[in-house]
Amino acid sequence: MGERLSVAVQGFHPSSFLSEETARLRELTQGMKVISAVSGGVDSTVATLVAREALGDNLFPIMIDTGLLRVDEPEQVKERLSRSPLSLKLRLVHASGRFLSSVKGETDAEEKRKKFRETFYQVLREEAEKEACEYILQGTIAPDWIETQGGIKTQHNVLEQVGIDPATTYGFKIIEPLADLYKDQVRALGRHLNLPKEFSERQPFPGPGLLVRCIGNVTKEKIRVLKEATKIVETSLSPFNYEQYFAAIIENKFAKDPSTKTISETASEALGLPNSEVHAEVFEDRVTGVKGDQRCYGLVAGVKLSEESRETYGWLQDRLRQLQTGIVEKFPDITRVALLVKERRGGGPLSIIVRAVSTRDFMTAAVSPVPWKILKDIGQQIMKEENVSRVYYDITPKPPGTIEFE
C-alpha cells in the first residue's frame, strides 16, 4: 500500500494527504492506464477524484451494474458524476445476470461475499484487458481490511491484506489510495476536492450491494422487493441525518425450538410486561454478528408486543436496550433482536427489517431512535407489497451485531 505520512492518530490534513498521494500514484503508474472501479459511494468516488488529480486522461472510471444496486442507481450515478464540477465520464458495465447466477442457491453469508468477489474481479479483469490496463484502482478504506483481517466478514474489495495476490489471481495490480483512512477522513478529503454534498455526505452502501441485506437465499423476487423497501426506508429516514439506514429482507421461516417460550419470558421481564403481551420468534436464517472481536453467525429474534404495548413502548430506548441485551446475553446463539412494527395476518412469505444506526467510525454503532410514528408509516408503505407480511425494526447495536446483516 505504501507509506502515507499525513495520516496521524490525532489529525488529518486533506491538502497534505492529496499532495503526497498524487505524487505516489504518478510514481507508481509511470504513465500507464488505470481502471477505477466506481460504485457511486463516497469511498470509490473520492478515490477516483484523487487518482484523476494524479493521472488525468490515463484514468478510466467504470461502474459495474451488478443487479444488486438501488432502483435505477447505475444510471443516476453516471448522470450525477457527469455534471459540473466533477465532469467525470463513467462507463457502465452491465453484468447483473452473472452476479445473480454466481450466488444462486447459496445461503451462507461468507460464501456469498466470496462468490460476489470472484465475479466482481472477473468482470474487472475483462474490462482491464479491453483497455490494456495493468492497474485497478478501488476505494478500500481502513475498516474494510480491519474487519476482513479480524475475521468478522469478508469485504469484497480486500485482497492483498488477506494474502490474495491480485496480479497472480486476476492478472492486474491493485491501487488503494484510501486504504489507511477512516470514513470521516474520506468525507473531509471529498469536501476538500469540492465533491458535492450528495456524494461526500452520502450514507455508505456496501460494495456487494443488496446481496448483504438479502438474508439467506438470494432470488430475483427477493431483490425486487428489497429494492422497493430500500427506496421507502431511505426516503423516509433521510431527513434525520442518521449515519446509515436501510432495509433488509428475510424469509418467514421460524425455528421450532422449545427455548422460544423462554425467550418470550426474557423479553417480558426486560420490558416489565405480562407474558401475555409479549411473543418472540426466532428466524431460521442466520446473520453475521460479532462476539469477542470475532465473527459469529447468529439467529435473529423477532419480538412482538401487543398493539397497546407497541404504542406505549414503541420507542423507550432504555427498555428496548434492556430487551436486546437481556435476550442476547441469555441466549448465545442469538446476535440480533428486532421489534415488530407492522404485520398482516395471512400475508406473504417475507419480512422486512429496518435498520438505522449512529456512528462516527463504523467500527461501533448505536441504534438510532427513529420516532415510532415514522416507523409505523414506513411499515404501512412497505406492507403494500403483497409478498411482505411483517416489518421489524432492528434494535441491535454494533457489537454484537454488525451494521450490515451479512
What residues fall within each predicted segment?
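ATP/NTP-dependent adenylation/nucleotidyl-transfer catalytic domains that generate, transfer
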Residues: 2-406
